[in-house]
């Protein structure tokens, strides 16, 4: 890198001194150069070039927002690639292996976070105003360089195979190789949504225990405690009884503790799971696996007190659009609307238990809203081998 520094001004050279990692040096230099130009000539927004130098020299979250104006499509072009600004500069100065905006979350004190960037003309690129969420276990710690956005027919396979060909996170993509505007699929025309956005069924091994819980609130906690009061924001598994419960199940239930929190972020078009317990939680979501370019059957481990995006609506709507007039594709897509969550014990190729029904305590989350969109599309599709959607079909 030293051989190239003489080509840049003193501000760029200084900022490059805090760069993390040795990969993609020329791209990082272009990214820093573009940022310096924007910070020098901006008249509005928050934060200066000096503020950026200060926070990089003295890393802390108690620092000013450093903003740049958003482009029409929300992305910043660096050389021949486009990317989300906050991801680009977190990649330069904090985490060179960042591959998706879903791996980042803004801190509470940030005034111009990416999550609310649709409501303002500016976005904060202070790398210390973002926290990194947990990466699903099995995702390489060193991600490859950004690749071209995949073509529509390779984003998802409707043949029922366990893997999908996906060059990058399809929607929204972190980077695209061409300089053009990247299309982000929006929610189709509205229709009458189901009264409950999802429902949860609790299982012990292969037996359902208790009623099916219908979720109306957008945020709900599922824990292992007993709560005699009826609450539509909390499901307490501790009060459910099962005469066939064995010692392994009893021991697992003791470790559920504070459990998980489900958040349907309607404004951000995704669903998050937060693990509030002191034990890991295991999740199988085909939508997440496709988004992370992993086998569709992959089981992700969420460490204690960590989060994972388990459903991305933009990706779903993109796949729904591609499944027009394809009943097999719609049947396959319905499987993406069922998410399995196991407490404490994992399953799959990395664990002794091969199937979720072999885990002591697990949940099935059925997403009613995307299933309703599929049902709406099915009514417009020739009915060949259409099946009632469920997690086992």
From Swiss-Prot:
Knockout consequences: RNAi-mediated knockdown disrupts tail tip morphogenesis resulting in retention of the pointed larval tail tip in adult males (also known as the Lep phenotype).
Family: Belongs to the dwarfin/SMAD family.
MH2 domain location: 197-393
Low complexity bias spans: 141-176
A Gene Ontology term for the protein's cellular component: heteromeric SMAD protein complex
A Pfam family that the UniProt record links to this protein: MH1
Superkingdom as given in the UniProt entry: Eukaryota
SMART domains tied to this protein: DWA, DWB
Biological process (GO), any one: SMAD protein signal transduction
Region feature (Disordered): 136-190
Organism of derivation: Caenorhabditis elegans
Binding positions for Zn(2+) per the UniProt entry: 65, 110, 124, 129
MH1 domain ranges (all copies): 10-139
The keyword S-adenosyl-L-methionine belongs to this UniProt entry's keyword annotation: no
Parts of the chain that traverse the membrane: none
Gene name for this UniProt entry: sma-3
Cell location: Cytoplasm; Nucleus
MF terms (GO), sorted A to Z: DNA-binding transcription factor activity, RNA polymerase II-specific; I-SMAD binding; metal ion binding; RNA polymerase II cis-regulatory region sequence-specific DNA binding; transcription coactivator activity
Predominant subcellular localization, coarse grouping: cytoplasm
Name of the protein this chain belongs to: Dwarfin sma-3
Function: Involved in TGF-beta pathway. Plays a role in male tail tip morphogenesis.
Alphabetical list of InterPro entries matching this protein: Dwarfin, MAD_homology1_Dwarfin-type, MAD_homology_MH1, SMAD-like_dom_sf, SMAD_dom_Dwarfin-type, SMAD_FHA_dom_sf, SMAD_MH1_sf
Bridged cysteine pairs (disulfide): none
Keywords: Cytoplasm, DNA-binding, Metal-binding, Nucleus, Transcription, Transcription regulation, Zinc
């Amino acid at each position: 890198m030293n051989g190239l520094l003489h080509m840049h001004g003193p501000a760029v050279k200084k900022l490059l001194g805090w760069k993390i990692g040795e990969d993609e040096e020329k791209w990082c230099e272009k990214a820093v150069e573009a940022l310096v130009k924007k910070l020098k000539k901006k008249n509005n927004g928050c934060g200066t070039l000096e503020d950026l130098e200060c926070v990089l020299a003295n890393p802390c979250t108690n620092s000013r927002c450093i903003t740049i104006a958003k482009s029409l499509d929300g992305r910043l072009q660096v050389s021949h690639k486009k990317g989300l600004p906050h991801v680009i500069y977190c990649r330069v100065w904090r985490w060179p292996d960042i591959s998706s905006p879903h791996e980042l979350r803004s801190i509470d004190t940030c005034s111009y976070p990416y999550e609310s960037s649709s409501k303002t003309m500016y976005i904060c690129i202070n790398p210390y105003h973002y926290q990194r969420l947990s990466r699903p276990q099995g995702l390489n710690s060193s991600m490859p360089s950004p690749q071209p956005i995949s073509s529509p027919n390779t984003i998802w396979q409707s043949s029922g195979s366990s893997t999908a060909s996906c060059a990058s996170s399809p929607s929204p993509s972190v980077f695209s190789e061409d300089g053009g505007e990247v299309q982000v699929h929006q929610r189709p025309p509205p229709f009458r949504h189901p009264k409950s956005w999802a429902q949860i069924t609790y299982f012990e091994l292969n037996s359902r225990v208790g009623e099916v819980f219908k979720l109306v609130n957008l945020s709900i906690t599922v824990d292992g405690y007993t709560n005699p009061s009826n609450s539509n924001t909390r499901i307490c598994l501790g009060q459910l009884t099962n005469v066939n419960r064995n010692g392994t199940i009893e021991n697992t239930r003791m470790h559920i503790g504070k459990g998980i929190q489900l958040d349907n972020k309607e404004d951000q078009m995704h669903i998050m799971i937060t693990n509030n317990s002191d034990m890991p939680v295991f999740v199988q979501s085909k939508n997440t696996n496709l988004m992370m370019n992993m086998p569709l059957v992959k089981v992700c481990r969420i460490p204690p007190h960590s989060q994972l995006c388990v459903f991305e609506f933009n990706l779903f709507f993109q796949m729904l659009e591609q499944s027009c007039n394809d009943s097999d594709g719609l049947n396959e897509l319905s499987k993406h609307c069922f998410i399995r969550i196991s407490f404490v014990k994992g399953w799959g190729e990395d664990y002794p238990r091969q199937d979720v029904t072999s885990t002591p305590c697990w949940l099935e989350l059925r997403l009613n809203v995307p299933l309703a969109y599929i049902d709406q599309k099915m009514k417009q599709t020739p009915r060949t081998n259409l099946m009632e959607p469920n997690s086992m079909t």
